[in-house]
A protein has these predicted regions:
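Short, structured patches in soluble enzyme cores that scaffold and shape functional sites
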Residues: 132-135, 163, 228
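Polyanion-binding interface signature
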Residues: 56, 61-74, 223, 238-241
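Short, hydrophobic/aromatic-rich beta-strand segments within well-structured domains
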Residues: 59-66, 129-130, 224-225, 256-260, ...
Length: 328
């Protein structure tokens, strides 16, 4: 499906959306976030982590629907990634963006949806569906339920927007979300690689800032990509191409690194070549007289995410080697 957006300032190029998802929201979660419009990045959490979330690709729209009998679509945003995280880490990342005023309130809300209550010492892993650029509709803008959404659907339902039966409903819903007039061209084929558009909300691979941290943690299975360290408090999501240099919050622009390794990477004492092999600068020994932990790993492949699409992009790695790495 191809959309065309119009605003008062510009007539945007076509932007492309192939799917949408409508999730059933907890009423307290929705009301808490609707009262805090400044929270633009939220966690649509799931009380258990057994199932992942593959219904959308990053950048596709995610809408929030209340339970019956209210049964209205009350807002939405753009899918920004999925991660399995302990409750404490989800709270550390997003705080009130989890839909609660405190970590304890978040734990209590999650406990109500689990088969067993959460004991004070437990820190269970939950499913975190990150949504960015969220908007909750005013009372006069809430929409009725989407087509074919059965009352017994518990978590939510995905929709293929290329199907004409759903097109009109979601064009209207999309307009409510982004605040522009929308046209639709059902004859245009979907092509994932399309350009990056003027409205930053519609960039297909961009993650929210906190979602970037969460999905990098999850993709690297909470292990430093260079040392394999698993001590969670010292693990940091590093950008290969930094934001001030034009980098983005993208999973393939990220590495999970121990905090001291992160500093050495940013300063060029360490790098990773486009074949994902560790590079160690001779300057590390010259400047500090040590670094054997890293020289012993030089030339070895780093820890990588399981999915090839999530692994560091060759272009970003080549930039770091050419621009940041201290060759001598």
């Amino acid at each position: 499906m191809r959309f065309r957006a119009r605003t008062n300032r510009f007539h945007a190029a076509n932007y492309l959306v192939v799917k949408a998802y409508v999730g059933v929201t907890d009423g307290n979660w929705y009301q808490f976030l609707a009262d805090r419009p400044q929270l633009q990045e939220v966690n649509f959490w799931r009380p258990a982590s057994a199932q992942g979330f593959r219904a959308l690709q990053v950048g596709e729209p995610f809408f929030f629907k209340t339970h019956h009998p209210h049964n209205r679509v009350v807002g939405g945003g753009f899918f920004s990634g999925f991660a399995r995280l302990p409750i404490s880490e989800a709270w550390e990342l997003l705080g009130e963006g989890n839909g609660a005023a405190s970590e304890q309130q978040m734990r209590e809300a999650i406990s109500r949806y689990r088969n067993e209550p959460i004991s004070p010492r437990d820190d269970p892993v939950i499913g975190c569906v990150f949504i960015r650029d969220t908007r909750f509709f005013d009372a006069d803008l809430v929409a009725g339920p989407p087509p074919d959404f059965a009352s017994n659907v518990v978590q939510g339902k995905g929709y293929d927007l290329a199907e004409r039966a759903y097109a009109g409903y979601f064009v209207d819903l999309f307009h409510r979300l982004i605040g522009t007039d929308v046209e639709i061209d059902l004859g245009a084929p979907w092509h994932r690689a399309g350009p990056v558009y003027g409205d930053p909300r519609l960039q297909p691979q961009r993650l929210g800032q906190q979602a970037f941290k969460g999905v990098v943690l999850d993709a690297y299975q909470h292990r430093c990509a260079i040392t394999g360290a698993k001590i969670r408090p010292v693990l940091q999501a590093a950008h290969i191409l930094p934001l001030p240099k034009g980098g983005e919050h993208r999973l393939d622009n990220g590495l999970l690194l121990r905090s001291d390794v992160h500093i050495m990477f940013d300063r060029g004492y360490l790098s990773v070549d486009p074949k994902h092999r560790l590079l160690v600068s001779p300057r590390l020994r010259d400047d500090f007289g040590n670094g054997e932990e890293f020289y012993s790993r030089s030339g070895m492949q780093i820890v990588l995410p399981e999915r090839k699409a999530d692994r560091p992009h060759r272009e970003f790695l080549a930039w770091h080697v050419d621009t940041v790495f201290k060759t001598a």
